[in-house]
A protein has these predicted regions:
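A short acidic, Gly/Pro-enriched loop at the edge of an enzyme's catalytic core
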Residues: 147-158
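A short glycine-rich, Lys/Arg-flanked "PGG" loop and its adjoining helix->strand segment in the class I
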Residues: 168-182
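N-terminal auxiliary segments of SAM/dcSAM-dependent transferases
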Residues: 1-52
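Conserved class I S-adenosyl-L-methionine
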Residues: 180-212
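Class I SAM-dependent methyltransferase SAM/SAH-binding core
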Residues: 94-97, 101-148
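Conserved Class I S-adenosyl-L-methionine
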Residues: 6-7, 225-305
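Short alpha-helix
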Residues: 204-218, 245-253
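Class I SAM-dependent methyltransferase Rossmann-like catalytic core
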Residues: 51-77
């Protein structure tokens, strides 16, 4: 865990800053958190459940799928957008990815922002274990997006939210007034050639309404663009895609394999997402006290990417 990242963290119990103390991080009131040998630190408060986070098998599938480059054009587009809207390097702040998964998208963004460090936050310990080695300037933390984030007020100059939960109040609290929030969300036809035949979760038709409800009290839309690409996925890639999302929980593996075999090999697939840029609204930030939100019923991360 880099010291340049630790400065942006906050104790999940008292909200105080953290400092290195041997192999642990410790706040001024004595709460201590061990840094795992893989380089990440868990800042999930005692008793917090990790339900909904990716399992180790799901993380391996996601890593395989993304490492093959299927969504490389999206990662590059997101990185270009981040570089275009980021404040001057003279303005302090980290790049925070809430629901970072393996750290794939955060690593791409840091590649375009050489003066910044990144903070990957995810409820899944297997995910942050992988994110900790996604880029040399990433620090990885296990944390819950629906609780108070273990991040200092105004710590982030950029916040990323890629196919992940959105806690508007907390995103506003941790984002600098000069910062920007980048949200990636699927369009109705995103990977439609797979979701239907494989019986996977489809895109919520009310996604724009839900996004507005979560963010409009705290952020204003500064811009949006659509990213589309034609993909060709062989059956191995399709299997990895299915295994990295909620299908891994509720779909019979034998039935899923049979459905994949009925697809063309390779199969033509449409990548269709919106990249939206939000700026913090002027005025008071969200209150500094514990910020929680009821966890929605669906899993925290979809198979969108």
């Amino acid at each position: 865990m880099r010291d340049e990242v630790i400065r942006y963290l906050a104790c999940p119990y008292c909200g105080g800053g953290l400092a290195r103390d041997g192999g642990s991080l410790r706040c001024g009131t004595g709460h201590a958190f061990d840094v795992a040998r893989q380089g990440y630190v868990s800042l999930l408060p005692g008793g917090a459940k990790g339900g909904g986070g990716d399992t180790a098998a799901m993380v391996r599938a996601r890593d395989d799928f993304l490492a093959a480059g299927h969504f490389a054009s999206l990662a590059a587009d997101l990185a270009r957008t981040a570089a275009a809207v980021a404040a001057s390097p003279a303005v302090p702040g980290c790049v925070l990815d809430v629901g970072a998964g393996t750290g794939y998208y955060l690593a791409a963004v840091l590649g375009r922002l050489p003066g910044r460090v990144g903070l990957a936050l995810d409820i899944s310990k297997p995910a942050v274990r992988r994110a900790a080695r996604a880029h040399q300037r990433i620090g990885a933390v296990a944390g819950d997006a629906w609780r108070r984030l273990p991040v200092a007020d105004s710590a982030a100059i950029l916040a990323l939210n890629v196919f992940a939960p959105r806690n508007g109040a907390e995103l506003r609290r941790v984002l600098s007034p000069a910062g920007r929030l980048l949200v990636v969300m699927p369009e109705r036809d995103h990977l439609l050639e797979l979701t239907g035949p494989l019986g996977l979760l489809s895109v919520d038709p009310r996604k724009d309404e839900r996004l507005s409800a979560r963010l409009s009290p705290y952020f204003g839309l500064a811009g949006r663009s659509e990213h589309r690409a034609a993909l060709s996925l062989d059956h191995r890639a399709v299997g990895a895609f299915a295994a990295m999302g909620p299908a891994a929980w509720h779909t019979d593996p034998a039935a899923l394999t049979a459905r994949i075999r009925r697809l063309p090999d390779p199969v033509a697939v449409t990548l269709a997402v919106t990249v939206a840029v939000f700026q913090p609204l002027a005025g008071d930030r969200a209150p500094a006290g514990p910020a929680t939100s009821s966890r929605p019923a669906p899993p925290a991360r979809t198979a969108a990417g």
